[in-house]
């Protein structure tokens, strides 16, 4: 896989150069673009936003993230998502129309699959069915390279992940994503991803390396202190089944109101500078 990652070319210097000068290093690297859904916006707002992004990025392509599953984040810091099945499937249809014939990487619903194990049996079956329908709509209506998010290496056994993927995936899905928004090391993530591939031999995977330069702080996942930037985005992973290292989580964006951080998704300059100071030197 040879993928030309796009670095967003807008100028953030005026926002951060005075107070958080070290944070500017983050914006020299390709990052991802997350899409939920805002029912207050016009129906075609997200579709047009994706189309504009793809046009600006051409001939390079960005990494997109669909993040709107009902009961998103199971009520935690990033809670939200579509209110009904109908609204979710409509969101996926509009997302797919936005992508169209382009072929960006698409990370499908971070944490939604492993979070299904926390739900009641009835709610779990409903979520898996909804994800399966969403994936069919997505892969039938756009040319995106789709990876289903499966959590990180310290969450579920590889066999359980394989069984969950069997329930929802389809032949047009490229594979799965590992370590999105987490801090597990690249080596650990590669080993775990390969174990999952034993149960899904046709799959490939990508790893979020945005904040794993120092690895995890024990089991802390919400704004752990002392972490660092990981390997920059690349397709040169030296592992046949690992397609790419990506910065899926935008470094410097908070995990939530924990350990001194602002609400989830807000830029936190102090953390951003800490990540840069502790970055992995390749």
Regions found by a protein language model. Give the residues of each.
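Active-site-proximal beta-alpha loop/turn segments in soluble metabolic enzymes
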Residues: 73-78, 110-122, 146-152, 177-183
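Active-site cleft segment of glycoside hydrolase catalytic domains centered on the general acid/base Glu
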Residues: 80-102, 110-144, 158-160
